């Protein structure tokens, strides 16, 4: 998955969370899915264990298929397609349609 990285700001383009934005916290490359902070939350019932004495209902983020999210262009604030541009020094950078670099650092 060359177009998405941990820490990228993405927007969900289809499904129940459509139009919402969040940062990627985890990438599951073998399943082609990503976990986005604060989106696609599910409630799981946790049984008490020696480590977790309380148990109860736990809310956590579930993975979303990578095809349902698009990186947000920092210049426009809108979802954009990503291409990889190779600089003169051979360094690769991901850029959006506006030409601005996408990514954390």
From Swiss-Prot:
Keyword vocabulary terms for this entry: Ribonucleoprotein, Ribosomal protein, RNA-binding, rRNA-binding
InterPro entries in UniProt: KOW, Rib_uL2_dom2, Ribosomal_uL24, Ribosomal_uL24_KOW, Translation_prot_SH3-like_sf
Keyword Aminoacyl-tRNA synthetase: no
Domain of life of the native organism: Bacteria
Gene Ontology MF, one: structural constituent of ribosome
GO biological process: translation
Gene Ontology, cellular component aspect: ribonucleoprotein complex; ribosome
Subunit text: Part of the 50S ribosomal subunit.
Biological role: One of two assembly initiator proteins, it binds directly to the 5'-end of the 23S rRNA, where it nucleates assembly of the 50S subunit.
Family: Belongs to the universal ribosomal protein uL24 family.
Protein known as: Large ribosomal subunit protein uL24
